[in-house]
């Protein structure tokens, strides 16, 4: 990711790593600090770190990036950097998920700044994962409960699901009125959806890759 640092603002960031809003206005907080020069690459790279604040959510992001070093090793004030990492990192849906679930979860992560939309999309991702495992009938709560009874999910996962709002139509408790999802609602369902995908797809895929690698090494 290449960004431009002009007028104390960051240009070129596609989404805020904190709230997910597209094309955020992020302003620099404090100086751009030189970190080190590495000779691992040619031209040599001068690394910097700096912080910025999203004008939409108000949260702070730490960035680490580099530019080609000049003859003196570095420039005093870089204007263009290649960003290698941000903290927090920009969330993305795991590639091991079924295509439909991956699409819905990615859209949900990118809609964190709009909790109602994030809630709906995350619920759709959960629905897609459950259907992929053969659980097609009933509410999300009912299907998660059935998958727990069958040993597909753990009892703890089922309890977690009942502790959060899975959709606007399935309130957590006995809410008299639903005025819309909160940021906390969105964060909780996103955390659950990512964990569900990790448990059902990502971890089994990692185990399978490890088994295949171990088998290949034994054959050598």
Residue ranges and their predicted role:
Residues 1-83:
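N-terminal cysteine/histidine-rich coordination modules
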Residues 73-86, 134-166:
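Short, charged amphipathic alpha-helical segments flanked by flexible coils
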Residues 92-100, 162-165:
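A structural motif
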Residues 97-113:
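A long, hydrophobic alpha-helical segment
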Residues 112, 129-133, 196, 200:
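Generic structural signal for hydrophobic core residues of well-folded globular domains
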Residues 113-116, 135, 152, 180:
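Residues in soluble alpha-helical coiled-coils and helical-bundle/repeat scaffolds
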Residues 116-137:
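Hydrophobic alpha-helical packing segments in soluble, helical-rich domains
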Residues 159-166, 170-220:
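Charge-enriched, short contiguous segments at helix-coil
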């Amino acid at each position: 990711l290449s960004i431009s640092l002009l007028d104390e603002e960051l240009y070129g960031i596609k989404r805020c790593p904190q709230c997910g809003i597209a094309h955020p206005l992020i302003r620099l907080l404090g100086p751009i600090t030189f970190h080190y020069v590495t000779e691992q690459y040619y031209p040599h790279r001068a690394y910097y770190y700096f912080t910025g604040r999203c004008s939409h959510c108000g949260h702070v992001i730490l960035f680490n990036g580099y530019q080609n070093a000049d003859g003196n090793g570095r420039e005093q004030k870089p204007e263009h950097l290649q960003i290698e990492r941000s903290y927090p990192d920009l969330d993305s849906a795991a590639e091991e998920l079924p295509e439909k679930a991956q699409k819905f979860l990615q859209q949900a992560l990118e809609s964190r700044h709009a909790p109602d939309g994030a809630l709906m999309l995350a619920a759709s991702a959960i629905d897609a994962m459950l259907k992929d495992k053969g659980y097609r009938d009933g509410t999300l709560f009912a299907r998660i409960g059935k998958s727990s009874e069958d040993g597909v999910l753990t009892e703890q996962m089922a309890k977690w699901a009942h502790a959060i709002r899975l959709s606007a139509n399935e309130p957590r408790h006995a809410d008299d009125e639903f005025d819309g999802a909160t940021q906390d609602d969105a964060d909780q369902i996103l955390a659950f959806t990512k964990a569900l995908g990790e448990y059902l797809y990502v971890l089994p895929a990692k185990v399978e890759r490890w088994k295949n690698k171990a088998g290949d090494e034994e054959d050598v």
